[in-house]
Amino acid sequence: MKPVTDANVFLISPNAGPSSFARKDCNRNLFVTSYQNDQVHEVLGQYAQESGVKKVVIVVPNYQAGKDAAAGFKHKFSGDIVEEIYVPLGQLDYSAELTRIAGANPDAIFAFTPGGMGVNFVKQFRQAGLADKITFLSAFTVDESTLPAQQDAALGMFAGADWAPDLDNP
């Protein structure tokens, strides 16, 4: 994007944008018609806060969108973040992280593990026996793109989203 915005040309992007695009790095020629990366995650932080959650473990991939997800959640959640776990983008085995989560004994986890990451994370979270003990809050982890593969492993897990195909909206 930088070459375009530096050329003083308008750029309209349908993709989510890093939160910095709406703050210090805002460019008057860039228009993002989608959401900001931290928006959906803020809603989940607010939900956790209003639901009485006290202790949370955050699990996100270690790249800009993951960092925005964690920051968005923390912006609205004032409870105790007992651990923030940043995993490599594309990670598929979560045995070490699940051991850390179980040891931290949180009320909830907040996960942003999109795509195949989320499919595996949800299945392994359930297989580890954590789904019956720890509230699972997620964004882009349990959604229309991952549910066909997650199936019953995702039952009872909460997902925040800006849209879903099965919403009963006129």
Task: Indicate where each model-derived feature is located.
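Extracellular/periplasmic Venus flytrap/periplasmic-binding protein
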Residues: 19-22, 28-128, 167-170
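Short, structured coil segments at secondary-structure junctions
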Residues: 7-8, 26, 77-78, 150-153
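Extracytoplasmic "Venus flytrap"/periplasmic binding protein-like
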Residues: 1-13, 23-25, 109, 125-134, ...
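Extracellular/periplasmic periplasmic-binding protein-like sensory domains
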Residues: 124-170
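Short beta-strand elements of ligand-binding domains
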Residues: 8-19, 34, 135-141
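Short secondary-structure boundary segments
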Residues: 15-16, 60, 113, 140, ...
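Short glycine-biased active-site loop of nucleotidyltransferases that positions the nucleotide triphosphate
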Residues: 3, 22-23, 98, 148-149
